[in-house]
Amino acid sequence: MDIYSATQSIKTFSTGIFPGHWLEMSKSRLYDGDISATWTLHRIVRDTLTAFSPVCPFFTDYLSTTLYGQSAVDIRAFPNLVVSGNVDVTRYLSITDDLIDFNSRIWKLKKDQGLSLKSEISKIDVPASLSDLQSSLTTMHSIV
């Protein structure tokens, strides 16, 4: 079992892809007090601590006990996917690369035009693969 590669993948997601793209896209919902966005953020943090617990038990024990009142080290099974109703979430498993590409393209376009990241920008089409995220991406990038 190659624990190094698994740990690096979790680290790459939790310190790079998740905050830089998924969390950035949800930021306005979090600021507005959206309970679903808040729950999802906590669920991801809690599950990430659980995944890291075999590798860094003292760190994950302290954080999970402080935040959630239960040590991630005591968890004996990897967390199950929790969705309400018959929601199909499998489509979200394959769009991270499209999300990263779209965000990078918008950020580069704004930088090349000397605009701040909060500046409005127009004539941008959200790719069809990201249509479920169009509202969040429009808000995130100030697309008019």
Show where each model-derived region lies:
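Feature 926 captures the class I aminoacyl-tRNA synthetase adenylation module centered on the KMSKS loop
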Residues: 1-144
